[in-house]
Amino acid sequence: MFLQAVTSPISINSLMVLAAYALLGGLYLIVVPLLLYSWMNRRWHCMGKFERLSAYGLVFLFFPGLILFAPFLNLRLNGQGEV
């Protein structure tokens, strides 16, 4: 009953559009940046020049999502911490 009362003024098409925007926003801000971080972390020291160029392009494209996770991820090499 509560769900019907909440969604009655909103049409099903509007809800589908909002769901599509939420899905695309989640992909752009969360899923793809995390996949990009993991891929760059694995491949950073063995990339070729074209692969590195494409990585830079993807960083430019997905920068808002990458900057959201930057304070929480530590991608330093092993042995670069405390002495």
Swiss-Prot record:
It is a multi-pass membrane protein. The chain crosses the membrane at residues 15-35, 53-73. It catalyses: a plastoquinone + NADH + (n+1) H(+)(in) = a plastoquinol + NAD(+) + n H(+)(out); a plastoquinone + NADPH + (n+1) H(+)(in) = a plastoquinol + NADP(+) + n H(+)(out). Keywords: Membrane, NAD, NADP, Plastoquinone, Quinone, Thylakoid, Translocase, Transmembrane, Transmembrane helix, Transport. It is found in: Cellular thylakoid membrane. One of its GO terms (cellular component) is plasma membrane-derived thylakoid membrane. Its EC number is 7.1.1.-. InterPro entries: NADH-quinone_OxRdatse_su_L. PANTHER family: NAD(P)H-QUINONE OXIDOREDUCTASE SUBUNIT L, CHLOROPLASTIC. Belongs to the complex I NdhL subunit family. NDH-1 shuttles electrons from an unknown electron donor, via FMN and iron-sulfur (Fe-S) centers, to quinones in the respiratory and/or the photosynthetic chain. The immediate electron acceptor for the enzyme in this species is believed to be plastoquinone. Couples the redox reaction to proton translocation, and thus conserves the redox energy in a proton gradient. Cyanobacterial NDH-1 also plays a role in inorganic carbon-concentration. NDH-1 can be composed of about 15 different subunits; different subcomplexes with different compositions have been identified which probably have different functions. This is NAD(P)H-quinone oxidoreductase subunit L. It comes from Prochlorococcus marinus (strain MIT 9313). The lineage of its organism: Bacteria, Bacillati, Cyanobacteriota, Cyanophyceae, Synechococcales. The gene is ndhL.
